[in-house]
């Protein structure tokens, strides 16, 4: 006698219309993470994942491509409006926002959450070229 197999329903991906875009920009790399309002990750992208290597990962162009890639991934999940949290001193801060605009995500808020030391660690010495 053949065994009966139960069909397990396939999990459907939930649609989210609003979310948060976390942009972490350093001098060496750019990482964009898109979450829902609870903080669950919907999509992410980084300069290395987009095919940039070495010093090109820290460029403004790489930041724009990274933001577009992550935004397209989340746009497929239904994201239309987002709040943007930018962290870090890198050169791609503004271009990452341009990438989000190009992908068609409406930005309702831009907040800078870069950590500012209250005279904490000693900064690295200045370069002499």
From Swiss-Prot:
Domain of life: Eukaryota
SUPFAM superfamilies: Translational machinery components
Annotated S-S bridges: none
Any one Gene Ontology cellular component term annotated for this protein: ribosome
Location(s) in or outside the cell: Plastid, Chloroplast
UniProt xrefs under InterPro entries: Ribosomal_uS11, Ribosomal_uS11_bac-type, Ribosomal_uS11_sf
Pfam family, one: Ribosomal_S11
GO BP annotations, alphabetical order: translation
Keywords: Chloroplast, Plastid, Ribonucleoprotein, Ribosomal protein, RNA-binding, rRNA-binding
GO molecular function, one term: rRNA binding
Subunit annotation: Part of the 30S ribosomal subunit.
Record-stated family: Belongs to the universal ribosomal protein uS11 family.
Protein name (Swiss-Prot/TrEMBL): Small ribosomal subunit protein uS11c
Organism listed in the record: Pleurastrum terricola (Filamentous green alga)
Gene: rps11
């Amino acid at each position: 006698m053949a065994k009966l197999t139960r069909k397990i329903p396939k999990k459907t991906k939930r649609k989210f219309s609003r979310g948060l875009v976390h942009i972490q920009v350093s001098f060496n790399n750019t990482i964009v993470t898109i979450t829902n309002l609870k903080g669950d990750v919907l999509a992410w992208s980084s300069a290395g994942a987009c095919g940039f290597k070495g010093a090109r990962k820290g460029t403004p162009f790489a930041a724009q491509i990274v933001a577009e890639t992550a935004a397209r991934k989340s746009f497929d999940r239904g994201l239309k409006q987002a709040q943007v949290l930018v962290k870090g001193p890198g050169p791609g801060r503004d271009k990452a926002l341009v990438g989000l605009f190009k992908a068609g995500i409406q930005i309702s808020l831009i907040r800078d959450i870069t950590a500012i030391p209250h005279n904490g660690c000693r900064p690295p010495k200045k370069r002499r070229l």
